[in-house]
Swiss-Prot record:
It is an enzyme of class 2 (transferase). Pfam families: ACPS (PF01648). It comes from the Bacteria. Its EC number is 2.7.8.7. This is Holo-[acyl-carrier-protein] synthase.
Amino acid sequence: MIVGMGTDIVAVERMARLHARFGERLTERLLGPLEVADMPVEAAAGAAFLARRFAAKEATFKALGSGMTNGMRWMDVQVGHDSGGRPQLVLGGRAQQLLRGLGDGVRSWLSISDERRYAMAVVVLERGG
């Protein structure tokens, strides 16, 4: 049974402008340690990376029914990968608490896609099945 679903789309150029303006302050606020290790150095690749991560985090907040409220931080949601390279959510802090509040056996599914101008993500939270 689906217990939560969220989606988000982000303009890569928006992330490029934010990163050019705020630099490391943006990455320190937005990314967790897992993600910082994967961040590309080259500017265009970095902007696309940030857009994908931002979309994944926003989609997760929506799936959890939370948004950036009640103590939620950007770093409470990180994107890692399983052994096959498939993206996985790694939740901590308030995000992990909200997921636990949905009951036992809730799994998360994350899909991320991007093109030159946009990045998008979909998160589905499923119990059982």
